[in-house]
Amino acid sequence: KVLSSYKLIVNPGVKSTSGTLLSNGKVCMIKTGMDDTDKFERIPDEDLLTLVQKQTFKYFWDFGHEYSGMARERTTSGDVVTTGGTGFGVMAMLVAAERGFITRQQAVERVQKIVTFLDKECTAYHGAYAHWINGATGATKPFSEKDNGADLVETSLLFQGLLAARAYFKENTEVESRLRADITRLWEAIDWTWFRKNGEDVLYWHWSPDYGFEKNLAIRGWNECLITYILAASSPTHAIDKVVYEA
């Protein structure tokens, strides 16, 4: 099937590299097409969905940092792990446990490793975490100039995963009860109101212990920003006012 047709016209006045003129012009017809033959074995939609879920999960599981369990920024990022990506990874682990890719015990152990690392070895800034963290030490890895402290949106992406895990691991066992308690403690420690910057009716993306709110980036938009306002409004300890959510 032809998708597009093009006509290439070479004018006889065109000179060669030696300076001579072409004796005759040329017209070439170029057509683009699509090779619609199968390149891989066809599989049912449900099998395709399972394969996509498995491969997505494998990134977070196989390439998770060996010490902290958190998600690496990319496969070549060494010790640099990402908070928001870790939230995505936690949710992938819940799917993996539910689908039987791993056991429930394996999933709860990995999530507990992540939570313990965040709790015991990472620096929290008014309860929020940096975008990048050294997965071996817990030290903040600056994401950009003057961005060496809290990233509230990345923290939100992290906690949407952790809160999903808290809801999923609901069995009355010592292991799952401990995980729920640890997640709750970290969740309740986030001071969302601090990020209003002098009480403004908007949340700010960054805060640095060295530069304060100098990056001055307000969190706005129907995108990854929305989860921040949902979590900030639903906090049991440091909820933002209704006017901030509605603004």
What is each model feature region?
Residues 46, 127-155, 171-247:
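Extended ligand-binding clefts on enzyme/binding-domain cores
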Residues 1-38:
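Acidic, low-complexity Ser/Thr/Gly/Pro-rich repeat segments typical of extracellular/periplasmic
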Residues 36-81, 125-128, 132, 233:
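Low-complexity, Ser/Thr/Pro/Gly-enriched N-terminal "stalk/linker" regions
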Residues 36-45, 88-102, 117, 157-172, ...:
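Well-ordered alpha-helical scaffold segments within catalytic/enzyme domains
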Residues 18, 63-67, 93, 122, ...:
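Sec/Tat-exported extracytoplasmic proteins
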Residues 79-87, 91-148:
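Membrane helical hairpin/interfacial module
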